[in-house]
């Protein structure tokens, strides 16, 4: 019986599952949007959102706790310098999971995971001068 056993196994043993979620969390913080399967996305939310909440207050202890969970020095820096201050006034719900159809090979449900309130990359089109203006 699996009474009171929360979380998903994701067809992995505990060490593999922990490493997978650590890597996915670091990738999410690095790129701010990733594509993965729906069960992994839902499980990722349980790992990544508490880290962002932790990063709202920057001190040495919280950085060490975040490093123990992420094991990526660069992403811990980004978490506390960029993501923590960005979500200072938001009381949770830092991620959005958008379903995006099924994977062609095995028909697994896929999803985009993105951080809300992320700065949009606006590439301005190069100014095209028309021939009439000349």
Swiss-Prot record:
The keyword GTP-binding does not apply. Keywords: Ribonucleoprotein, Ribosomal protein. Part of the 50S ribosomal subunit. Contacts protein L32. GO terms for molecular function: structural constituent of ribosome. PANTHER family: LARGE RIBOSOMAL SUBUNIT PROTEIN BL17M, RIBOSOMAL PROTEIN L17. Belongs to the bacterial ribosomal protein bL17 family. This is Large ribosomal subunit protein bL17. It comes from the Bacteria. Disulfide bonds: none annotated. The gene is rplQ. It comes from Thioalkalivibrio sulfidiphilus (strain HL-EbGR7). GO terms for biological process: translation. The lineage of its organism: Bacteria, Pseudomonadati, Pseudomonadota, Gammaproteobacteria, Chromatiales. InterPro entries: Ribosomal_bL17 (IPR000456), Ribosomal_bL17_CS (IPR047859), Ribosomal_bL17_sf (IPR036373). One of its GO terms (cellular component) is cytosolic large ribosomal subunit. Coiled coil: none annotated. The keyword Ribosomal protein applies.
């Amino acid at each position: 019986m699996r009474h009171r056993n929360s979380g998903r196994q994701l067809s992995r043993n505990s060490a593999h599952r922990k490493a997978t979620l650590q890597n996915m969390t670091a990738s999410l913080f690095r790129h701010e949007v990733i594509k993965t399967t729906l069960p992994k996305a839902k499980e990722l939310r349980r790992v990544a959102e508490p880290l962002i909440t932790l990063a709202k207050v920057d001190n040495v202890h919280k950085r060490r706790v975040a490093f123990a969970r992420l094991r990526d020095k660069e992403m811990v820096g980004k978490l506390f310098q960029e993501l923590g201050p960005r979500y200072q006034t938001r009381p949770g719900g830092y991620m959005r999971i958008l379903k995006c159809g099924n994977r062609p090979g095995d028909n697994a449900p896929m999803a985009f995971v993105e951080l809300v309130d992320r700065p949009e990359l606006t590439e301005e089109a190069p100014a095209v001068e028309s021939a009439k203006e000349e």
